[in-house]
Each structure stands twice: as structure tokens, then as C-alpha cells.
Amino acid sequence: MDGQIDKMEKRYSMTKLENRLRTFQDGVALEKKKLKWSFKVIPYQAMAKLGFYFDPVIDPKTSKLKKDSVRCCYCHRQTYNVRDCRSKRKDVLETLSNIMRQHLTVTDNKQVCLLIYLRNKLLTDYSFHMGVSDWKNDKYFSNPDDENVINLRKFTFQDNWPHSGSQNEHPLGIEKMVNAGLMRYDSSIEGLGDPSMDKTLMNDTCYCIYCKQLLQGWSINDDPMSRHYKVSQNGNCYFFQTRNRFERIKNDNDSITKNCEVSPTLGENGKREVINTKTASQRQCPLFESPPSSTGPQLDDYNEKTDISVIQHNISVLDGAQGENVKRNSVEEKEQINMENGSTTLEEGNINRDVLADKKEVISTPTAKEIKRPNVQLTQSSSPIKKKRKFKRISPRKIFDEEDSEHSLNNNSANGDNKDKDLVIDFTSHIIKNRDVGRKNAILDDSTDEFSFSNQGHNTFDIPIPTSSHLLKGIDSDNDNVIREDDTGINTDTKGASSKHEKFSVNSEEDLNFSEVKLTGRDSSTNILIRTQIVDQNLGDIDRDKVPNGGSPEVPKTHELIRDNSEKREAQNGEFRHQKDSTVRQSPDILHSNKSGDNSSNITAIPKEEQRRGNSKTSSIPADIHPKPRKNLQEPRSLSISGKVVPTERKLDNINIDLNFSASDFSPSSQSEQSSKSSSVISTPVASPKINLTRSLHAVKELSGLKKETDDGKYFTNKQETIKILEDVSVKNETPNNEMLLFETGTPIASQENKSRKLFDEEFSGKELDIPIDSSTVEIKKVIKPEFEPVPSVARNLVSGTSSYPRNSRLEEQRKETSTSLADNSKKGSSFNEGNNEKEPNAAEWFKIDENRHLVKNYFHDLLKYINNNDATLANDKDGDLAFLIKQMPAEELDMTFNNWVNLKVQSIKREFIDDCDKKLDILRRDYYTATNFIETLEDDNQLIDIAKKMGIL
């Protein structure tokens, strides 16, 4: 019984805002634990204003502690899982609205919580600037005289209403306020604004939810019904309209207007005249104008000297005989009346005497204190400037002063007169500033700084920075334009040259400026080299006889400058290349195929620099820098795609190749690890692997033919070669003649990760070859050591009799030939592997389950690299890897939208994942049954002891 009384007292005490705030601030004790509100995203001040207080409980159904439980002070219902109502946009109003909607969806037999319903509606109206709502069609508040609505209005006055000495007899008691359609002020009508403003308004401020007018500053002579009627523009409120409809009360002088009449004061001597009083500021602002009443005398003597004061909230005109009260109240009204117009002043004893009266009507004007919120109908008809001034005077929110705002607008307009309204980035001036200052802009420049956006973004997704050639060409064109704009006084054109050659005729000063611009990318030297070759080739074609003497001296200077830079860079690259301990070398027997002796044999492509030097008469690249080609090398073949020949000199820049193979990568212990790092090419099973090292992903040099040698001991040599090749190689797998090529274009991506890769099981000793790096073919033969044990003895029974190579590959044939030699070594293992060959599981199946998934993952990852490196789109990538992907897609997938295609792929991946998991579980289950069966049937104690020692049991 005492517990129930305590709960009831707690509920009644929670009607006060201070008590609700204390529950969030101090916390609540539950089962000898102190629990506090821990959600900083949900402000507890706003929760308390809405009517919630912190009340953590234990859920009786699940017996779990609800740390985010709150309770309503009106309906006393609890709301759980408040944390799930947090806004993803971190919008506080949206979060609070979600909490209130969740509170309203509590399923029980009780009526809906009208307090939370009303405050949610008011908060929504404030958020969307809806003004006065349509209460006519509202489900709960369409009838202001409904019993539940009246009880809600009474509930709002229970929190220390200052005029409730005797509720029934006092003219400002709770009953009078409720009957007038007023509610106690809460900040939900103002969007839960400034707390300091709430304290000033919470004293005796009331408002009507239908017309949203605030009333405060009550005096003992005020009538709540009369003030509400007048503030709402003589009954322009849904509350009075519904009273007339339901109670059949006529809105005339004998009903509500009669109650609004002003009682005479001592100085009037029985006169009951109501006149319209307007100050200078009120005449400028139409908000304070009220609709004319039906009756009232006309003022005859306009110049009559009478002391008139607007001091009472019942809108009566008082005589100057009120003495000190008149002076004191007039001083209080001075600040609000003179807010916009500084010329109007109210001094003590000197009241403004500009009194106007209509001919036959009397206009009653409320004071500034009465109207705290603008009427929507009036504000829509006024000008923007007046609306802004009225909003500043009426709204309780803090707004900057008119003079400050106008001053700031004048400053902004003065500063922005000569600027365009649209945001325009002047890249020309930016490049000039970058050249002079020597610093880069983190946004306009593709910076590679540690904290730059470009570097962080590409590192996060493991995507290389886009450094395609046409991007650099755009930079070059910008630089060229800047230089020509700066150096307008210098003659840069060759008068006698044709228009084709004029773009290469630049002066030496421009080249000096150009050399200071840093190219973005890792291989800027390659771009400079290509630029040098193009310039040299075009300069060599100029008819120098037609060039005047004035323009000829500048061309050699430019030519020599670019040549010096390119020679230095190529010399450094050449020295670095010759200092390598081991480079890619080919044996003559691998380079040629016995299929035919003509040009259809395997060919190693000649470097593109050599081809350019052969075509250009004035090449600036020294001959000693290029690697010397072998004598047997012939002219490379260009790949034929759909009947079109791709030019052999087509080259994609900025693809830096650097991939190293170490001797440890070819060890047998890393065989299982290599299965998860396989090549990203999606093609037919691998035959004799040919690693085609090329810088271009578009023009892949397809080497025809496949070397067919007899299956003898020549395949197994004791040579060991450590092959170090460069990064991002393009691996092209070829198939025998009896197999059909899956990829006809020859352009699937096979770029490896920036790590050392293992190709085969064996180790190779290093040799150095003079094969050109950027276009060479290396064929690697498998080397088997006789003493090599391919799988540890403990797991040999899981892999014997299986092959990790494709069924029709030549490596599979080599594996079969060496199976006899490996069988002798396998017999030397422990007897743990004997007698279990009948039920041994297929270990290669385990290692190959994820092979296809890795291939697809690597393929799309490399495709993304390709797109970023070359800025590939369907418009400019006619025969590249992106176009290859689209050509290989089924017709039904091409007709799908992107979202449907992604959903289809996600579903297929899910199904494949479930199938792979089932396969792995079957393999593990098989292994477990095999091992347990072997241990249970083993009778040799020594073998059991050995197995226990190996497993770490003994």
C-alpha cells in the first residue's frame, strides 16, 4: 500500500518541470544501482519539456534492464528503446518527433496520450512552418469543449500557476483560463527554443493552440475570454467559431463583444467612449490594426487636449488622472512600442496625443504585450520588410537588430559588386599563383600529401591515383595557355611554319616555366619522355627552309632543353636497371616454337622506344640507354580484335610495373597460400603459362602458337632461376589448339597485387637477360626436386591422388610423369598414412573451393584499377577491358537496371557461399570420420604414442 502511495506521489510530482529534469540529471536508483541518462544525442532538457522523465525499469517479459526507458507525466506510460529513435541526420527535432510517435504507438486499451499528441503536432508545424493548423479535421481536438481536451488544458496549469489562490473565485483562476480556451505555455510551440526565454514566458504566459496567440502580463481586472477574443482579431479563431456553431451563440454586441466592453475609470466622469488610439509606430505597422467593431461614437474634437494612455490589457482608453500608475505603465510600454520607430517616445507625463477616430466606427487596438505571435492572414498581405520587423518584435526568439543586418548587407553588397553571383574557379590565375608561390591547393590540385583527400581516398579503397595520359595533356594545355597569356610580349609563333607545326614552336622561357610544373603520378619521367619524342618527331618534319631567321633560334633551345632532361632521366633509369642483381632472362629454346618457322612463332616485342627511334629522324633518346634487343627478335604482331588491328605504338602511360619474385615464394610450403592469391584472369584452365609483360592493357601483344615438346626428361632440369619482374603485369593464359579461347579480344585484366608472387613450387637460380622489360614473354617450366616431399606427412593422406592443376594442362601431364618418383618418397612416411587411401578426402577440393570467388574478386578489383588509371568510360574505351566486360555480359543482364543487376549478383553470391560452406563442412566431416576411424582401429601402441606426441597430447 505504501509503495502504491509513493508511486502516486511520484506521478503527481512529475507534473513539475524541475522534478522531471532532476531525474535525468541526478539519475535513478534501481536495484542498488545508480542509473543515469547516457544519450547525449537526445537532450534531456527537451525530453523534460515534452513531458517525459527518466524511469529505467526491468522488462517483466524478458527480465532485461531497460536503460533507455522514459515515462510520460500525463498518461504514465513507458516508452522503451529510445536509442532506436535517433535521427541518422543527427537532427534533434526529428529525434524527438520519433520518440513521441513511438510513445503514441503503445498498444493498450487506454486512450491516446493527448499531451504528447498535441506537442508532436505543434513541433511538426513549427518544423515545416505550417502556421495555423487545420483543426477542423483533427481527430482529437476538433471539438474544443470535449471533456478530454478540457482535462488536458487543466493539466497544463497544475505546474505552479501564479493566479490560482482560489480557482473558482479568482478572475484568473484555472477554470476561467480553461473556459477561455487557453493552455499554459510550453516551448513546443516555439520548437523547444532558448531555455532562458522559457523561464520568462513560463511565469503566467498562456496560448491558444488554435490561433497560436500568446497572452501574458495578466492583471486582476482582466477577463481571459475577452482578451483571447480581442487578441484573435475579434474572434478570428477556431475556438470561437466552434462555440458559435455548437452553442448557437451569435457573435454580436450582446454576446462576446458585450463582455469586452471597458469599465469606466475615475477620470472619465461617467463617459463610456472607446476610441482608437494609434501611435506613430502603430500607424506604420498594420499588425496592430484590428477589424472595426460594430458600434462606437465618433470623436468630434480632434485638437482637444486630453491625456490618453494605452496601459491596460482590456484595451480601454484611460484618463491622465490615473497618476503614478499611468506613468509607470507608460514607461514599461515604451520599449515595445518604440522598437522600430525611434521617433516615437513616451515620456513621463507626456503621452502621445495623436488620436484618430473613424467616422462611424471605433477601432480597438491591443497593446504590444498582448500579441506575441503574428496572425498568418495579416502577415501574408504585408511587405517583406514590415514582416521582418514584426517578426522581430513579436517572436520570443532572439534576432539580430535591424541596423546590424542592414549594415552587414551593405558591406556584403559593397564587397560583392564586382563579383559574379555564380561560383567561378579561375584555374588560369590559380596555376600562375601556384608557379609563383610554389605551393599547391589541397582541393584544386591532385595532391599526394599525407593528409590530402585524394591520397586518403585512394588508400582507403586500395585504388591507384588516376594519372592517365589525357589528364596530363589537359594540364599541359592549361600550362601552355597560362604561359602564352603571361608572355604576350614574346613572339612564340613561327611565321613560315604551317598550322600543324605551330603548336610545337615555343620559346625557351616557356619551357623553363613548364619545367617547374610538377606532374601528378609516379612515372612523370615516362610522360616527359613521350612528350620529348612527340616534339622531336614533329620538329623533325618542319621544313626549316621556310622558317624565318627570327623563329629558328628558339626551336633548338627548346629541343635541347627537353632532350637534356629526358637524357638525364633515362640515364638514371638505365643505370638502375643495370645494377639489378638478377633480371628477366630467356633461353633461346623458350623463345621459339616448333609449330612453324615463320612469323607465327613466339615473338618478343621490340621496345616501343626502338620503334619510335626508327620512325623519327630527330629522336632525342641516346642509343646507349635502350636495352639491346636480341638478334632473333622480330617485329611484334598487333592483336587483332574484331577484324581491326590495334596499332603497336599505342601506349597507356602511368602504369608502373614492379613485381619481384623471391626464392622463398617458389618453396612448396607456400603452395596453399598461393591458392588464395591466384591470378585475377577469368579464363579457361591454364595450359603452358605464358606471362606477357606489357605496360598497355589495350594493345596486348598476343603471341601465337604453343610450344609442343616431347614429354621427356627435358622438362625437368636442375636449374634454379629467381625471376624478378615488375609490378602490375598483364598475364595472358593461352590454351592448346584443341581448346577454344574464351576471351577473343585478349584483354582480360590480370594485374597482380603489389606483393611477391609465387608461380610454381620450385626454386630457380637467377640469370640476367637483356630482354626489354616493357614487352617480353617468359615461359617457365616446372622443376621437380627428387627429394622434395610435396605435403607434410600428417596431411599426406588428404592430398595424395589429387591435383591442384587443371585437368587438361601440361602441368598436369608433368605431374603424372613424376608421380612414380614421388610415390617412392611418400612410402617413407609413417604408417599413419597407410590403409586410409580408400576414404581419403579430396584436399584439392578444399583449396579450390574459393578459387572462382577469388578470381572474380581480383578481376573486378583490377578492372577498377584499370578504370581509374585510364579514366575509362564506355565512350572512350571502345576495345578495352571495360568494353570487354560489357560484351561478355548476357543479354538479360544488359537489359537490367543497375540496382536489379547488383541484387541479382548479391543473391547469386549468397547461394554460392552457402554451397561452398556445405562443401567445406562435408570435407571437415569426412576428415573427422577418417581420423577417428583410424585411431579407433589402430592396434599398435607405439604408433598411437607417436601420434599423440605429434598432436601435442603427450
Curated annotation (Swiss-Prot):
SUPFAM superfamilies: Inhibitor of apoptosis (IAP) repeat
Compositional bias ranges of the Basic residues kind: 385-396
Listed Polar residues bias regions: 593-604, 819-835
An example Gene Ontology biological process: attachment of meiotic spindle microtubules to kinetochore
UniProt xrefs under Pfam families: BIR
Assembly and oligomerization: Component of the CPC complex at least composed of IPL1, BIR1 and SLI15. Interacts with CBF2/NDC10. Interacts with CBF3D/SKP1.
PANTHER family in alphabetical order: DETERIN (PTHR46771:SF5)
Alphabetical list of PROSITE patterns matching this protein: BIR_REPEAT_2 (PS50143)
Region of interest (Disordered), ranges: 375-419, 541-645, 661-685, 798-839
Positions annotated as BIR repeat: 20-117, 153-241
Keywords: Cell cycle, Cell division, Metal-binding, Phosphoprotein, Repeat, Zinc
A GO cellular component entry from the record: microtubule
Organism (species): Saccharomyces cerevisiae (strain ATCC 204508 / S288c)
Function as written in the Swiss-Prot or TrEMBL entry: Component of the chromosomal passenger complex (CPC), a complex that acts as a key regulator of chromosome segregation and cytokinesis.
Stated name of the protein: Chromosomal passenger complex protein BIR1
Keyword field contains Cell cycle: yes
Single GO molecular function: metal ion binding
Phosphoserine modifications at: 477, 508, 552, 587, 751, 765
Keyword Membrane set for record: no
Record: residues binding Zn(2+): 208, 211, 228, 237
Basic and acidic residues composition-biased segments: 556-583, 809-818
Disulfide bond annotation, renumbered to this chain: none
